[in-house]
Regions:
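Residue at a conserved register position within TPR or TPR-like alpha-solenoid repeats
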Residues: 30, 64, 84, 97-100
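Conserved structural position within tetratricopeptide repeats
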Residues: 11-14, 44-48, 82
Length: 103
C-alpha cells in the first residue's frame, strides 16, 4: 500500500465529491492493506454515489465478514446479487450466491 496513493485518491475524492471512482480506488488500497474498517466506510460512501454492478457490494460483504459483521455482510452480498443480475452479470451473481450458500 502506498500512503502517497491514498493521499492522492483522497484529494481526488475531495476535489470531485460526486465522482465515485476515486472512492472505489481508495477502497481497493485499503483492502490491500487489510484496513477493513476503512474499506467498509469507503465502499459505503462509494455506493451512495454509484450504480454499482456488483463488485463493490461483494467487496463490502467480504470486508464486513473480515470484521465478523455477518448479518451486514450477508446483506451486502444479497445486494451484490441483485446488482449483478440487474447489470447482466450472472456469473458474478452466482459467485455471491455461492458465498451466501456456504455461510
Amino acid at each position: 500500500m502506498s500512503e502517497e496513493r491514498i493521499a492522492a485518491l483522497r484529494k481526488m475524492a475531495e476535489a470531485k465529491p460526486d465522482d465515485p471512482r476515486p472512492r472505489f480506488g481508495l477502497a481497493l488500497e485499503f483492502e490491500k492493506a487489510g484496513r477493513w474498517d476503512d474499506v467498509v466506510q469507503t465502499l459505503r460512501d462509494y455506493l451512495q454515489r454509484a450504480d454499482d454492478e456488483g463488485n463493490a457490494w461483494g467487496r463490502l460483504g467480504a470486508a464486513l465478514r473480515h470484521l465478523g459483521r455477518d448479518d451486514e455482510a450477508q446483506e451486502a452480498y444479497r445486494k451484490g446479487v441483485e446488482a449483478a443480475y440487474r447489470h447482466g452479470h450472472p456469473t458474478m451473481a452466482g459467485e455471491f450466491e455461492d458465498v451466501l450458500d456456504s455461510w
